[in-house]
Regions:
Chain A
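Glycine-rich phosphate-binding loops of nucleotide-dependent enzymes
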Residues: 2-272
Length: 272, 420
C-alpha cells in the first residue's frame, strides 16, 4: 500500500436530466492495488467509470491524479493521463487480428505506411510481459478466440500504452470458471506490475480473490471503502443491497423514496 | 524495444515458422472454417472458361475475344472496385450505376457540347462523382438515413439527371481521340512487356523486402518458397496474358494491325494497386475495416466514424465516374441508358462473386477484379453461344445469388467453427 493515491475523486455528482445517478462520490485508487468497485445493477458503477474516462462530464467534484488536480474532459484527456478502460462490452473488431485490435486507432506508422513489424513486436512484448500464453498466433482474427482470450486481448490492449490506471467493467461476467480464473490472475498480475486497477464485479468470489480494497456504491452513493481483509462476504452483500452493514455504510435510511434511481427499474437502462 | 530475447517466450514464437506443407494446411483449414476468400471466383472462372472453350472453341478462345473480355468488363469492374469500399462498411450504393451515367454525361457535355479539352472533361466527370459521393455520404452518416434508401433515391434521381443532361433523350457522341483511345486502343507490344516486367519486379521487391524485414525482426514469415511461388505465379499469369494480347488479332493485317494490351488494363491495374495499398497499408484502410467490423469499437478507439462513412461513398462514386468515362469511351457516346440496365447489378455481383461480404468488414479491391472477370466471361461466353439478353440476365442473377449464398453460408460456417 502506498502513501499518495494515484487517483482520488472527491464529491462527484452526476445527473442525467432529472435523475441523479452519482451523489457526492469519493474514491481513492492506489498503485499496485486492485480496488473492487461493487454495487447492485444501476448503482452507478458504469457511470462512475465513464466519468473517470472522460466520456461523461461531471456536474461537481474534484479529480486528483498523483495528488495534482486534473480536469478530464474527454477520453483523450484520460488516455494521456494513462487511464485505460476495458468496457463491459468488449470493444474489439471481430474481423481484425489481435495486433490490429491492440493498436486500433493508434497505429504505428512509418510515413503513411503502417509499421506492421513494430506493432507485432510491441504486441508480442506486451503479451509476454503479462505472461499470456493462451493465444497461439498474434495474426489470428479475434473472431476465432474464446471469450477468455478476447478479454485477455482487451486487457493487453489497455496496458499497451504505458497506462497507470486500468479500469475493468465486469470483465468476467460472460466467462466460464476456468477462463474467469485466467482473467482474474491477469488482473492480479497487472497490480503486481505496479498498475492501479479498478475492477467492477458482481461476483463476491472474484472480488475477494483479487482485490486489496472494496468500494461499495449504493444508489449512487459511496457507502464504504475498506480493505478487503477488514470485511466479510456477508458485510459486502449487505452494503450492496441495503447500503449499510453494522457500523459501515449509510448512517440513516436513505430510502426517502423518489429522488434516487431505483435498482429494479434501471437494469435495462444501464450501460451494457 | 528490440529484444529478440523477449520474443523467444513471446506468444507468437510458440508456433514454429511454418513449412510449405504447413502453410497449405493452414490455408485449407481456413477455407474449411468458412474463410473461402477468392476461391469461388477463381474456381468459377476456371469452370466457365472450360465450358465455353469446349462449346465455342474457335470464337471463345481467340486472341480477339480475350482482348474483348477486358474492354467489355472494364466499366463494371471499375464501379465494383469502388463498391467494395461501401460494402466493407456493410452499406450499399444502388446509385453507382446511374452515377456513372451522370458523370459520363457530364464528360460528353464538357468535351463535345462545350468543346473543352479531354482532361477538363475527365476532371469534371470525376469532380461530379466526388460531389455525388459526398452528398450520399452526408445523408447516410450525418442525417442517418439507411444507405439503401438514400442510394435507391439516387438511383431514380440520377436516371432522370442523365435524361436531362442528354438533351432530347438521344445521345451525345464522344469523338475526342484521347477519350476514345481509353477503351478502344492498345499499348504497343514492347510497352506491354515493359509494364509487365515492371509489375513483376515491383511485386517481387515488395514481397521480398517484407519477408526480409520480418525475418530480421524475428517475426513469423511465410516460407520463402511460398513467396517465390506467389511471385512466379504472378509472372506466369501476366506473361501469358500479355503474350496472347500481343498476338495479331486483326482479320486482315494488310488493312490494319490490331494487337497489344488494351489501355484499360493498365488503368485498372494502377487503380487496383493504389486502392489495395490504401486498404491494406494505411491506417485509413485499417479504420475502414474496423468501422465495418464493429462501429462502436471503432468509435471508442477514437476513429472518426462519420468521416470514414462519408469517404467510402466519395470513393465509390468517384470510381463510378471513372467507370462511366470508360463506358463512354467504349460506346463512343453517352445515351440515357449509360450506366443503366444491368450495370449496377453486374458491379455488385462482381464484388460479391469475388468474395466481398455483403455483411461488411470483409473484402478486397482484387475481389472486384476477379468477380468482374467472372461477370465478363458469362456475358461474353453466353453472347457467343447465341443466348438472348433475357437468358444472360437470368444466369447472371442466379450467379449473384449463388455468390451471396456462399457469402452467407461461409459466415455461418465461420460462426460455427470459430467461437462466434
Ligand atoms: N446515458 C444515460 N442517460 C440516462 N440515464 C443513464 C445513462 N447511463 C446510465 N443511466 C442511469 O444511471 C443509473 C446507473 O447506471 P449504471 O452506471 O449503468 O449502473 P451499473 O453499472 O452500476 O449497473 C441507472 O439508473 C441508469 O439507468
Ligand atoms: Mg454496468
Amino acid at each position: 500500500m502506498s502513501a499518495t493515491p494515484l487517483l482520488e475523486l472527491r464529491g462527484i455528482d452526476k445527473s442525467f436530466g432529472p435523475v441523479q445517478v452519482l451523489r457526492d462520490v469519493a474514491l481513492t485508487v492506489h498503485p499496485g492495488e486492485v480496488t473492487a468497485l461493487v454495487g447492485d445493477n444501476g448503482a452507478g458503477k458504469s457511470t462512475l467509470v465513464k466519468c473517470i474516462s472522460g466520456i461523461h462530464p461531471t456536474d461537481a467534484g474534484e479529480f486528483l491524479f498523483n495528488g495534482e488536480p486534473v480536469h478530464i474532459g474527454s477520453p483523450r484527456d484520460a488516455a494521456s493521463l494513462g487511464i485505460e478502460v476495458v468496457y463491459q462490452d468488449l470493444a474489439l473488431c471481430d474481423n481484425l487480428d489481435i495486433v490490429q485490435n491492440m493498436f486500433l486507432g493508434r497505429e504505428k506508422r512509418s510515413g503513411i505506411v503502417l509499421d506492421e513489424p513494430t506493432m507485432e513486436q510491441l504486441a508480442a512484448e506486451t503479451l509476454a510481459g503479462l505472461s499470456i500464453r493462451t493465444v497461439t498466433s498474434l495474426r489470428q482474427h479475434v473472431s476465432s478466440l474464446s471469450g477468455g482470450q478476447r478479454q485477455t486481448v482487451a486487457i493487453a490492449k489497455a496496458v499497451l500504452w504505458n497506462s497507470k490506471l486500468v479500469i475493468l467493467d465486469e470483465p468476467t461476467a460472460a466467462l466460464g470458471v476456468a477462463q474467469t480464473a485466467q482473467v482474474l490472475e491477469l488482473v492480479r498480475r497487472l497490480a503486481d506490475n505496479g498498475l492501479a486497477v479498478v475492477l467492477i464485479s458482481h461476483n463476491m468470489n472474484d472480488v475477494f480473490a483479487v482485490s486489496d480494497r472494496i468500494a461499495a456504491l449504493y444508489l449512487g452513493q459511496m457507502v464504504a471503502q475498506v480493505k478487503t481483509t477488514d470485511i466479510t462476504h456477508a458485510q459486502v452483500v449487505e452494503l450492496i443491497t441495503a447500503g449499510r452493514s453494522g457500523g459501515l455504510g449509510l448512517a440513516t435510511d436513505p430510502g426517502s423514496n423518489g429522488d434516487g434511481p431505483q435498482p429494479a427499474d434501471s437494469t435495462s437502462g444501464g450501460v451494457r | 524495444m528490440t529484444t529478440t530475447a523477449v520474443r523467444k517466450d513471446g506468444p507468437a514464437a510458440v508456433t514454429p515458422t511454418p513449412t510449405i506443407g504447413g502453410h497449405f494446411r493452414n490455408y485449407l483449414s481456413r477455407v474449411r472454417g468458412g474463410d473461402v476468400g477468392a476461391l469461388p471466383a477463381v474456381l468459377g472462372l476456371i469452370v466457365l472458361c472450360t465450358v465455353f472453350a469446349i462449346m465455342r472453341p474457335s470464337s471463345f478462345l481467340s486472341a480477339g475475344n480475350f482482348a474483348n473480355l477486358f474492354t467489355q468488363g472494364a466499366a463494371v469492374t471499375l464501379i465494383a472496385m469502388g463498391l467494395v469500399f461501401v460494402l466493407l462498411l456493410g452499406e450499399i450504393d444502388l446509385s453507382a450505376g446511374f452515377a456513372s451515367g451522370v458523370c459520363a454525361a457530364v464528360l460528353a457535355n464538357v468535351v463535345t457540347v462545350l468543346g473543352y479539352p479531354w482532361w477538363v472533361a475527365v476532371l469534371a466527370a470525376v469532380a461530379t462523382g466526388v460531389v455525388i459521393g459526398t452528398t450520399l455520404g452526408m445523408l447516410v452518416a450525418k442525417i442517418g438515413i439507411p444507405s439503401f434508401v438514400v442510394t435507391l433515391a439516387g438511383f431514380l434521381a440520377f436516371q432522370g439527371v442523365v435524361l436531362l443532361l442528354v438533351k432530347d433523350g438521344t445521345n451525345i457522341s464522344v469523338r475526342d481521340d484521347v477519350l476514345v483511345a481509353i477503351a478502344n486502343r492498345n499499348l504497343g507490344p514492347t510497352l506491354g512487356w515493359a509494364l509487365t516486367a515492371l509489375a513483376v519486379v515491383g511485386y517481387a521487391t515488395v514481397q521480398l523486402l517484407r519477408h526480409r524485414t520480418r525475418a530480421a525482426r524475428g517475426l513469423i514469415t511465410d516460407p520463402i518458397a511460398v513467396v517465390a511461388l506467389r511471385i512466379g505465379g504472378l509472372a506466369v499469369i501476366l506473361g501469358a496474358a500479355v503474350y496472347v494480347l500481343n498476338l495479331e488479332r486483326s482479320r486482315n493485317v494488310l488493312i490494319s494491325s490490331l494487337k497489344g494490351v488494351p489501355i484499360v488494363v493498365p488503368i485498372i491495374a494502377v487503380l487496383l494497386i493504389i486502392w489495395t495499398f490504401v486498404l491494406q497499408r494505411t491506417s485509413y484502410g485499417r479504420h475502414i475495416y474496423a468501422v465495418g467490423g464493429n462501429r462502436e469499437a471503432a468509435r471508442r478507439a477514437g476513429i472518426g466514424v462519420d468521416r470514414i462513412r462519408i469517404s467510402v461513398f466519395v470513393i465509390c462514386s468517384s470510381m463510378a465516374a471513372i467507370g462511366g468515362i470508360v463506358a463512354a469511351s467504349r460506346a463512343n457516346s453517352v445515351d440515357p441508358n449509360t450506366g443503366g440496365s444491368n450495370v449496377l447489378l453486374y458491379a455488385v455481383g462482381a464484388a460479391v462473386i469475388g468474395g466481398t461480404s455483403l455483411f461488411g468488414g470483409k473484402g478486397r479491391v482484387l475481389d472486384a477484379v476477379l468477380g468482374g472477370a467472372v461477370v465478363a466471361v458469362i456475358e461474353n461466353g453466353m453472347g457467343l453461344m447465341g443466348y438472348t439478353a433475357g437468358v444472360k440476365y437470368v444466369v447472371t442473377g442466379v450467379v449473384l445469388l449463388l455468390a451471396a449464398s456462399v457469402d452467407a453460408l461461409s459466415r455461418r460456417r465461420a460462426a460455427a467453427t470459430g467461437t462466434r
